[in-house]
């Protein structure tokens, strides 16, 4: 990253520079000691800009102002949202303590800095200064020393080896980052070399006449030196994200089971959604798609004589017919209690749809054998634990092709019996979601206890969709003291669902929210290689993959969101949120009151991700395993060692995704390994890779016919030494047919 120093500018001039300058400023240091800004103007500046800003107010260097005046300005910047605060190590201790507390409270990264304008001190003084800056709150330590010889430069740059050793010894502490370079003409090259050695950013002047210190490069010169001809990703208009297939598939099946007309707005076609429509039609529902071009009845999608990628073909056909890939409304005329499941249903390539339909087939099949089949990679993906779980409800699964684990094609033979049952959630949430949809249809009440739950958010997505269709389900989460204090779902040890029998699905009308799984690829691309703005996303979503926001923030990304406000009557404080939110607060909800047909929606708005200095991170993806491919790419560009838990969850996705990720990273030249449930990745910043010649290796890659792998490879291609050629990109049609066209709007 390149941090441009802005000084001697008014608020209006600074805002114009941040919003309109060409080339675009990546990151800026605002010299509050030199810019004539009032406290109100400081608050406006640091609260309004999406560009990562460093608040700096020098007292030692210039001798202007007092420490008390500097504290007032810096505090205002931090409270307004400054990404970084730079405080000289010479600041009075009490002021340092107060500013450190403010940084912790408001999420600002503290830089403690020391400048040696008279010359470069001894090695001991340099190392002791680094340690002092670290001791007094420096998450980033900045050392700048005037160089009088090449030896001076070498000694300053040697600090990077010293800080690496210190970080390795302090295993329980967050690693401290170092920005160390030499000043003066002799030290000019060190301002570039520091990026090679792991500095999160370097400083540059706005132009050749405004250097803040001797030897400072101008921004345009530094851009060329670091990036060459590579242009950042950028799109002038926000990109609209497709409908969440997690919500859409559940809602389509629920609408088919409701008696009457349901309207699902914001629909966008993809392979899994179209498979759900075909199942809904097989149950007897009538389905129409209403778009700007009018309405049309959805015809059957033939299984015979499909081309190499049947999912891409059928979705492409639908997109051509409707003339729109997003923003349509599904009108589903459900058949309610007269649902008559056919002897054979095809679930496409959808693992979720398979597991939803197994319990529903048992509940609706009147004791008959119902065959469930699929296409693409689905017949190769085992349904681990499904036979044992369903046997507990009196249901028998029989695979048609003998194998150690149950696969489709298979037959399901009921009955599905109500009652009290405890099952393991280690295998995931999808079959549990199917049970939540089927058990309300039975004559008796059921209590379903899930121990060792995984993918918890998806269970509550199901509960949310069911609530919208009039189904009553109570829930209570369990956990130890850590869970009760933090409400961190990864600490939840059990969930109990209480399900009343004899219920009927009621028709509903609501908009399907945008897909955070798809959005994750664009947010990571923006955080790494430029900037991106997205719309159509619910910022209070139950989707597990909204966790990408937390992961990016942990890595240091620059994110902002502007909510359009509550949709369809939801309150600003979220108080009309559903039982899933109650469960997240460790409450029990029996949902005694039937929901309104038009269920309230969440907050929609504009999400922005912009390039920022990134650091290694630790995260647990057990509840959101679909993020693994793109989070792995993120980690490859975050300086340091990242640890990602949940690796064991990847074996039975559209590919053996864990193996596919390791193979991809190894081929790219990224150091990665898996041990137990943890994937470890040694990352290097984009700038370090460019300057050290450590670009990702281009060439021919396989997506393993996995839509999420294809998307991750597409994002990674920006920083490859030659084009990344993906053997199968049509697989993106499974979840986001327009992905490549949408991604192409991010101009380089």
Residue ranges and their predicted role:
Residues 1-64:
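Conserved N-terminal beta1-alpha1 strand-loop-helix module at the mouth
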Residues 4, 28-31, 84-87, 140-146, ...:
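Short catalytic-loop micro-motif centered on adjacent basic/acidic residues
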Residues 5-7, 27-35, 56-58, 66, ...:
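Catalytic beta/alpha-barrel core
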Residues 8, 32-36, 59-61, 89-91, ...:
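Active-site-proximal loop/turn and secondary-structure-junction residues that shape catalytic pockets
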Residues 91-223:
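Catalytic alpha/beta core domains of metabolic enzymes, predominantly
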Residues 221-304, 309-582, 586-748:
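Short, structured segments at the rim of ligand-binding sites
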């Amino acid at each position: 990253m390149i941090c441009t120093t802005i000084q001697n500018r008014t608020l209006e001039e600074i805002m114009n520079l941040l919003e309109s300058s060409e080339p675009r400023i990546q990151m800026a240091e605002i010299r509050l000691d030199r810019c004539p800004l009032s406290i109100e103007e400081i608050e406006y500046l640091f609260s309004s800009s999406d560009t990562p800003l460093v608040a700096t107010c020098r007292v030692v260097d210039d001798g202007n102002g007092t420490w008390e005046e500097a504290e007032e300005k810096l505090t205002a910047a931090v409270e307004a949202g400054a990404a970084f605060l730079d405080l000289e190590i010479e600041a009075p201790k009490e002021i340092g303590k107060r500013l450190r507390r403010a940084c912790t409270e408001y999420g600002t990264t503290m830089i403690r800095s020391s400048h040696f304008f008279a010359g470069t001190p001894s090695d001991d003084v340099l190392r002791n200064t680094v340690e002092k800056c670290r001791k007094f709150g420096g998450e980033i330590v900045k050392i700048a020393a005037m160089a009088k010889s090449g030896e001076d430069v070498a000694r300053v740059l040697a600090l990077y080896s010293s800080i690496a050793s210190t970080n390795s010894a302090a295993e329980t502490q967050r690693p401290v980052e170092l920005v160390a370079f030499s000043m003066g003409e002799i030290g000019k090259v060190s301002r570039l070399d520091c990026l090679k050695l792991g500095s999160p950013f370097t400083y540059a002047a706005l132009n050749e006449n405004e250097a803040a210190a001797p030897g400072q490069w101008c921004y345009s010169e530094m851009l060329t030196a670091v990036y060459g001809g590579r242009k950042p990703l950028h799109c002038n208009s926000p990109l609209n994200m497709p409908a969440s297939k997690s919500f859409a598939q559940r809602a389509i099946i629920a609408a088919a089971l409701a008696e009457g007309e349901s309207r699902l707005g914001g629909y966008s076609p993809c392979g899994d959604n179209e498979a759900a429509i075909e199942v809904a039609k097989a149950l007897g529902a009538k389905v129409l798609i209403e778009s700007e071009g009018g309405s049309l009845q959805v015809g059957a999608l033939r299984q015979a004589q499909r081309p190499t990628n049947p999912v891409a073909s059928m979705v492409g056909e639908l997109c051509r017919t409707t003339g729109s890939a997003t923003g349509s409304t599904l009108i589903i005329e459900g058949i309610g209690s007269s649902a008559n499941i056919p002897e054979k249903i095809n679930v496409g390539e959808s693992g979720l749809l398979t597991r939803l339909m197994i319990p529903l087939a048992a509940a609706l099949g009147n004791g008959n054998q119902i065959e469930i089949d699929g296409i693409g990679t689905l017949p190769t993906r085992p349904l681990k634990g499904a036979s044992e779980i369903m046997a507990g409800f009196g249901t028998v699964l029989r695979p048609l092709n003998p194998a150690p684990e149950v696969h489709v094609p298979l037959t399901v033979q009921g009955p599905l019996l109500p009652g009290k049952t405890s099952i393991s959630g280690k295998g995931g949430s999808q079959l549990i979601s199917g049970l939540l949809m089927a058990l309300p249809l039975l004559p008796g009440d059921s209590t379903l206890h899930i121990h060792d739950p995984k993918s918890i958010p998806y269970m509550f997505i199901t509960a949310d969709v069911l609530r919208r269709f009039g189904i009553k389900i109570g829930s209570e989460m369990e956990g130890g003291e850590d869970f009760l204090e933090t409400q961190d779902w990864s600490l939840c040890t059990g969930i109990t669902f209480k399900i009343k029998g004899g219920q009927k699905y009621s028709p509903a009308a609501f908009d399907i929210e945008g897909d955070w799984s798809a959005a994750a690829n664009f947010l990571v691309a923006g955080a790494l290689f430029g900037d991106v703005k997205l719309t159509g996303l619910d910022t209070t979503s139950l989707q597990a993959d909204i966790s990408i926001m937390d992961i990016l923030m942990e890595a240091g990304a620059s994110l902002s969101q502007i909510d359009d406000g509550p949709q369809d009557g939801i309150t600003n404080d979220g108080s009309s949120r559903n039982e899933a939110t109650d469960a997240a607060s460790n409450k029990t909800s029996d949902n005694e009151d039937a929901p309104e047909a038009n269920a309230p929606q969440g907050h929609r708005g504009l999400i922005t991700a912009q390039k920022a200095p990134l650091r290694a991170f630790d995260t647990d993806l057990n509840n959101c395993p679909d993020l693994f491919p793109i989070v792995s790419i993120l980690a490859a560009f975050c300086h340091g060692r990242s640890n990602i838990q949940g690796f064991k969850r990847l074996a039975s996705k559209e590919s053996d995704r864990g193996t596919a990720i390791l193979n991809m990273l190894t081929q790219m030249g990224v150091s990665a390994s898996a041990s137990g449930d943890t994937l470890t990745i040694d990352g290097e910043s984009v700038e370090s890779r460019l300057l050290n010649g450590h670009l990702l290796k281009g060439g021919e890659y396989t997506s393993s016919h996995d839509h999420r792998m294809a998307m991750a490879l597409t994002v990674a291609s920006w920083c490859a030494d030659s084009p990344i050629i993906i053997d199968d990109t049509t697989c993106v049609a499974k979840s986001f047919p327009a992905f490549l066209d949408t991604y192409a709007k991010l101009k380089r």
